[in-house]
Amino acid sequence: TGEIYGNSAQISGNGILKSTDNGVTWSPLPSTLSASIPATHQFAYTWRALVHPQRDSQQVYVATSRAGLYRTTNGGSAWTPVLSSNALFSDVIVTRNGTLYAAFGAFTGTQGAIASRWGVFRSTNGTTWTNVTPPDMKNTVKRIVLAEVPQHPEQIFVLAETPDEGAKGSTIYRGEERFEWHSLWKYTRTSADTGTWENRSANIPMTDEQRGDFYSQGGYDLLVKVSPHDSNLVIVGGTNLYRSTDGFTSTKNWKWIGGYWKPTPSFDKYSSYKDHHPDQHDVLFHPTDPKQMYSANDGGVYVTDDIRADSVAWRDLNRGYLTTQFYTVDIPNMPGFETSRKIIGGMQDNSVWFQNDEEEPTTTPWQRVGGGDGAYSYFVTGGLSYSLYYSSQQGRVYYVRNGITGKESYRKRIDPIGPKDYLFINPYVPHPTDQNTIYMAGDNQLWRLNDVDLIPAGNTDSTLIGWDS
């Protein structure tokens, strides 16, 4: 448990949970619990718990944050440190022949400090370790993740955020272009003590699309996995998910298969790949069906029935998985809508959604209105029916004009040029009697839009039209 490197918060866990009935029930291991809350010991933040498949289930390895690698040989009753490091990021895997690999970034969380142990390490017994770090990996490396090659237990893939080294990708964050560098290696063990590294960083996915480049948000979302059915089918993930069918030996055979997507329509700056979600954390291949793969990300769990398809299709498996968090909700409060069951709401990391069912709102699917982190949203009088204001993070506000049947006539972006320092979920409110007027907080000022109808339909960016402060 514990998340040391969240997008918006650092959340202390409290130890490790164990199940002895195939995941039906879970119990905390007393040896990993902290006497204080929030927890401060070595198990307050863990990156991975690994049961050794070739030993019995009593042998478990745990990669921690700032406390290195720990091992238990008695099912968690007691733990022994086997590889110390104060690195913020760590990982551990085991190959099909029982060889263990551990990784530590050089980043400690303190600017300028270098971890006491960083790089990639190999062990055949879990107690003695050999440093096999790629020779061109530098002590600026941040997060490192590892993947076995199931068909070839002498091989692994290594993906890392490597500032100023490797493939340079960009994204748009708070209206500004941001850059990150990542590196990808393949390691082949050639003898008991030696191996060779192949740097495949030049083939990390990059596109000409907004939010199409490989980008991991400082290592927050970072994964690499190899299919157990085909050693050339390799998946990498950051904000987006990508598939290669030649092990990233070239730039010709990879596809963008999840996460963000090309802005459609152009005003939706946070369009998502259909039936998928940004910020990738893991994938799992089906053990017997070579086409089926599960994807875990900030939106939950998704599955595809054909990972090799030219256009990969996903199914959402989050029904009944009750983690949705609404920042705001609104219901119609206008003449003619007194008995309406319509609802609109902005969800944490899950867009703005709208329920348009007048009969039974508990059974009709909701409709996605806009992307990003859903924020303040309102029903208002407008046109021949009702209209909508909705917003996403950092003060982006939109207006949807509906026709007499309630169908969308047009939409436009309406937030003002000028304010820079918005709250992440930034408030604004329509005037109670003139709902073409809204008031909005921005920086240390109050802004007023005098008439939303002045802004042209289809506008896709911030505007000066109609605003004063």
Please annotate each region the language model reported.
Residues 1-469:
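Beta-propeller blade termini and top-face loops
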